[in-house]
């Protein structure tokens, strides 16, 4: 149990997808103008990661990994070259289901997220978490914990940045830095803050 708690904390703070690996920066910067919208997208990312990482782990270990098809009588088969397109297909299917659900039950949030909701499909934070899962050879439980933790970490980062940007609307920001300029600086300072967690040993 201690191992899973450690993995969760590490994936939220120490190995934050947005502020440590700088993954998913396009939506991170574009949707972080309002806290409510950022929270909505953050929850969507948590849901997609919590499902896609363990789902892709099952597919990879059961079908694509070298020797995974031993149960089918072909122990020498290696379909790992199909992993990228398979992972993207699974992520795209999950995002499509999420998009239809939000459109039906949460229209205001669906309209607020706009084009950025389908862009979760190509959000490199989602694919990055799946790729890390394969590289680190996580089992199913570890994949679930890592997916949830990575989603929470990314959501935390975008909500914090959105809160900072809302405050900056009423600040005296120099003309040359208004907009994305001060946003990049703020995100960089947040990343420096999260970097302090890198010395924590779990």
Curated annotation (Swiss-Prot):
Name of the protein described by the UniProt record: Na(+)-translocating NADH-quinone reductase subunit E
Topology within the bilayer: Multi-pass membrane protein
Gene: nqrE
Coiled-coil residues: none
GO cellular component terms listed in the entry, alphabetical order: Gram-negative-bacterium-type cell wall; plasma membrane
InterPro entries (UniProt xref): NqrDE/RnfAE, NqrDE/RnfAE_oxidrdctase, NqrE
Matching HAMAP family: NqrE
Bilayer-spanning residue ranges: 11-31, 35-55, 79-99, 114-134, 144-164, 180-200
EC number: 7.2.1.1
Keyword Iron-sulfur: no
Recorded GO MF terms: oxidoreductase activity, acting on NAD(P)H, quinone or similar compound as acceptor
Family: Belongs to the NqrDE/RnfAE family.
Enzyme class: translocase
Subunit structure, as described in the record: Composed of six subunits; NqrA, NqrB, NqrC, NqrD, NqrE and NqrF.
Biological role stated in the UniProt entry: NQR complex catalyzes the reduction of ubiquinone-1 to ubiquinol by two successive reactions, coupled with the transport of Na(+) ions from the cytoplasm to the periplasm. NqrA to NqrE are probably involved in the second step, the conversion of ubisemiquinone to ubiquinol.
Highest taxon, organism lineage: Bacteria
Any single GO BP term: sodium ion transport
Entry keyword set: Cell inner membrane, Cell membrane, Ion transport, Membrane, NAD, Sodium, Sodium transport, Translocase, Transmembrane, Transmembrane helix, Transport, Ubiquinone
Cell location: Cell inner membrane
NCBIfam families: nqrE
Catalytic activity of the protein: a ubiquinone + n Na(+)(in) + NADH + H(+) = a ubiquinol + n Na(+)(out) + NAD(+)
